[in-house]
């Protein structure tokens, strides 16, 4: 049982990272969708496996059987989960739940920043705040840093974040990384992909790739010089240097090899998620069957 659950869990994480290596060869919108699905799917596979191990271990404990009315035949009717593995699974699930709660709380705190709190600040800050309605917050310091054409880029970039609902992708990726810390690199890739997507939308809006590259570079340099950390859904966000380099090049296409490797990773991830789901379902069905539960 343990190996049957650990194997698809490992395959899911490896497949996710393998497919994620294709990020730079995909259009930013495709990369955002692909990476988000990969991170969410890999986290789901890992959590399903941990839940199955934790449930299997709990079902073997006589004390819990008396409390919940489980039948004793469970203890001798299937492969037992070793105590270190079972306890580790429960600890990992608890840590995941706490980590996700903390991550979501911190993100909500950032999103509560109001226009009044930031607009008059001398620090160069610009970011989008999702909601109904969503809003774009640009500080006085950022406006003074950029010329009029570059300001237009900033607003186009931030409105793209709102229009494309990029916060939803970030929520999934952040929750996945909080639940499974191994997936933190994928979360960073999703943040970078959403910024690249907004950059390309800004290019469509202003019609000048070099202008967008210059605006991104100046915003990032000003923020760095002021000690301002990159903000989610902000033009000074993830990977400014790599974004500028991408903007200085013409838009790239997608090769057959890229699609093939990406598809292979997605298939491997899907199989792993399905495998862990089936294993968990079989465990629950097994307990219900031999205990005569309905």
Residue ranges and their predicted role:
Residues 1-120:
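N-terminal membrane-targeting/anchoring modules of bacterial envelope and secretion proteins
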Residues 4-12, 16-17, 75, 79-110, ...:
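Cytosolic-facing loops and C-terminal tails of multi-pass membrane proteins
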Residues 34, 157, 198, 244:
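Divalent metal-coordination and catalytic microenvironments
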Residues 37, 175, 215-219:
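Short acidic/histidine-centered micro-motifs embedded in hydrophobic/aromatic stretches
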Residues 84-159, 164-167, 171:
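Peri-catalytic and regulatory segments of divalent metal-dependent proteins
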Residues 165-187, 191:
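Post-HEXXH active-site segment of zinc metalloproteases
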Residues 169-172, 208-217:
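Acidic/histidine metal-binding catalytic segments
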Residues 192-207:
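An active-site-proximal "capping" alpha-helix that borders the catalytic cofactor pocket
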């Amino acid at each position: 049982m343990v190996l049957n659950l650990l194997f698809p869990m490992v395959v899911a994480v490896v497949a996710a990272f393998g497919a994620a290596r294709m990020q730079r060869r995909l259009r930013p919108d495709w990369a955002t969708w692909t990476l988000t699905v990969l991170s969410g799917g890999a986290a789901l596979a890992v959590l399903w496996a941990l839940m199955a191990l934790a449930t299997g271990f709990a079902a073997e404990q006589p004390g819990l059987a008396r409390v919940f009315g489980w039948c004793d035949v469970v203890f001798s009717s299937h492969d037992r989960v070793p105590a270190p593995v079972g306890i580790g699974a429960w600890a990992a699930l608890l840590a995941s739940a706490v980590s996700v709660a903390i991550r979501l709380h911190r993100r909500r705190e950032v999103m509560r920043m109001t226009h009044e709190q930031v607009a008059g600040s001398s620090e160069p800050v610009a970011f989008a705040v999702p909601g109904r309605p969503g809003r774009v917050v640009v500080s006085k310091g950022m406006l003074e840093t950029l010329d009029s054409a570059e300001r237009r880029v900033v607003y186009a970039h931030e409105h793209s974040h709102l229009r494309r609902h990029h916060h939803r992708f970030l929520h999934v990726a952040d929750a996945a990384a909080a639940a499974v810390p191994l997936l933190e690199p994928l979360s960073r890739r999703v943040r970078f992909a959403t910024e690249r997507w907004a950059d390309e939308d800004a290019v469509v809006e202003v019609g000048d790739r070099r202008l967008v590259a210059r605006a991104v570079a100046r915003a990032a340099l000003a923020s760095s010089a002021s000690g301002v950390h990159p903000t989610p859904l902000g033009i000074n966000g993830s990977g400014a240097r790599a974004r500028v380099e991408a903007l200085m090049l013409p838009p790239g296409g997608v090769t057959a090899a890229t699609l093939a490797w990406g598809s292979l990773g997605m298939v491997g991830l899907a199989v792993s998620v399905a495998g862990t789901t089936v294993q968990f379902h079989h465990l629950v069905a097994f307990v219900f069957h031999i205990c005569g539960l309905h």
